[in-house]
Amino acid sequence: MEERMGEILTAARDAATVPSGLMNALVYRGQGSKQVEIRPKPEIQHADDAIVKVLKTTICGTDLHILKGDVPTCTPGRILGHEGVGLIDDIGAGVTMFRPGDKVLISCITSCGKCEYCRRGVYSHCLTGGWILGNEIDGTQAGYVRIPCADTSLYRIPQGADEDAFVMLSDVLPTAFECGVLNGKVEKPGISVAIVGSGPIGLSALLTARFFSPGQIIMIDRDDNRLAVAKKLGADVVINNAALDPTSEVKKITGGTGVDAVIEAVGTPEAFELCETLVAPGGCIANVGVHGRKVDLHLEKLWSQNISITTRLVDTVTTNILLRAVEMKKIDPHQLISHHFPFSRILTAYDTFARASATGALKVIIDMAG
């Protein structure tokens, strides 16, 4: 039987077709290793499950952290990916909000809606969910994905909706908005904001910070191409910290005080320590970046400055707000998308995304039909 299955899988790869009941998937194979494999199509396991046929997905910086070995909960053999748009293929007996054929946005966070944490709006720590897609259970970089707690982990979108735009609402926009903008208290109009890192998260923080009319937004990065995008999206000042001392520049701009809110959108010790030098007394540092190494916290300098430091894993409590903002054209997620690839070129897509400074990549869209 195993020999026969191996023949089927080999034939499927050679013919670039997949037999019924099987699907293509990108699989994590240990630190630094990933490969395209033929996998069985997922099946309903619990009454609240839905099976979604994935139409579009994308690659997240967190996927790169998994490949670096920074996420020990993700073990070899796991299908990667936690973002996407698709069509409901099948539902469990307990699913009441969706029917086969519905087009849906897949949230990066799975939430039961019933446990203590979900009742507090801390969906990322749901006792049966949280960030499990592409981490503790198989994810969205595949032909199909099983979504637990479907009624509270999927969002219906119009049949004619732009799929690429809505993929940006799975993770990157809610993460930047909740963990950066809201945690950073940017909702106070007129305040000064510095965003360290102008990748997809930093640019998403820029887009959503503008909801609240901050007095000034300063973007800091080492990549002139990304800084040019930031300027186009509304940054008031851009600073290349490979060429200039960002602390001195920010102090000049703010009359020596620093900024009211700093959003860390990189996830390196150097970026976090830079944030500590940029924040004004009474200000806030909102950490969004995923850190795989320890960071020095300079309390000897900060203890008397009334500084708040926040951390958060996205809870996707703002997804409905952002859906409405996109539908009303208050925000254009296309501005975050730089590349499109068919699934057959997903390894090239990963390489392009990982070498963003050379390729100019922001978010890349993977079309599962290709």
Language model features with spans:
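Residues in the short beta-alpha loop(s) of Rossmann-like NAD(P)-binding domains
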Residues: 223, 291, 315
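NAD(P)H dinucleotide-binding glycine-rich loop of Rossmann-like/cofactor-binding domains
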Residues: 112-196
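Short Gly/Pro-enriched turn/cap motifs at secondary-structure boundaries
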Residues: 16, 29, 41-42, 75-81, ...
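Mid-domain Rossmann-like dinucleotide-binding core that forms the NAD(H)/NADP(H) cofactor-binding site
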Residues: 161-244, 248
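C-terminal hydrophobic helical "lid"/dimerization subdomain
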Residues: 2-23, 273-277, 316-370
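Glycine-rich beta-strand-centered segment in the early N-terminal region that forms part
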Residues: 40-57, 68-116, 158
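Residue-level recognition of short, solvent-exposed, well-ordered loop/turn junctions
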Residues: 45-46, 99, 188, 280, ...
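Glycine-rich cofactor phosphate-binding loops and adjacent beta1-alpha1 units
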Residues: 4-7, 184-189, 212, 228-308, ...
